[in-house]
């Protein structure tokens, strides 16, 4: 498996993650595909990045880094769209993807935030994120500096 920084995301490359996530009742992967296709979010702003985990050229997981759109504070990044195909979960793929996002975020951001409503919360906490209190748009954060 390799983790690559992507600047292009052909829609067919994430068909499997989009389909699997929708079967599980999650729409965020569909939103990722639509926003990339429309140009609304291609993770190409200052300090932003998008990573994919690949096996044999096949995307098995993704995770992105954006400037946090939910705050006006400077120096705040946001972890976006972490998804790993179910067959590859609990193998460290998500940990490696988020690790690359954290590494990229350290170059530009002071704080990294995210929002999750699923079991990935435990992964984020193991990686050093702590729970946000009193913020509707944030469940976890990490101070980078």
Indicate where each model-derived feature is located.
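Conserved GNAT acetyl-CoA-binding A-motif
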Residues: 105-117
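Conserved beta-strand in the GNAT
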Residues: 52, 58-68, 78, 83
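Residue-level recognition of the GNAT/N-acetyltransferase active site
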Residues: 80, 85, 89, 117
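Conserved catalytic-core motifs of GNAT/GCN5-like acyltransferases
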Residues: 113-115, 125, 130-145
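Conserved acetyl-CoA pyrophosphate-binding loop and the N-cap/start of the following alpha-helix
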Residues: 88, 92-100
């Amino acid at each position: 498996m390799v983790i690559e920084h992507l600047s292009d995301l052909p829609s067919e490359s994430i068909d499997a993650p989009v389909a699997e996530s929708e079967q599980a009742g999650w729409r965020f992967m569909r939103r990722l595909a639509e926003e990339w296709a429309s140009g609304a979010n291609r993770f190409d702003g200052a300090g932003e990045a998008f990573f994919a985990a690949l096996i044999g050229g096949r995307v098995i997981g993704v995770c992105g880094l954006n400037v946090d759109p939910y705050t006006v504070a400077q120096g705040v990044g946001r972890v976006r769209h972490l998804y790993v195909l179910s067959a590859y979960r609990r193998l460290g793929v998500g940990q490696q993807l988020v690790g690359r996002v954290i590494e990229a975020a350290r170059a530009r951001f002071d704080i990294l935030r995210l929002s999750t409503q699923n079991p990935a919360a435990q992964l984020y906490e193991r990686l050093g994120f702590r729970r946000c209190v009193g913020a509707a748009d944030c469940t976890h954060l990490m101070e980078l500096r």
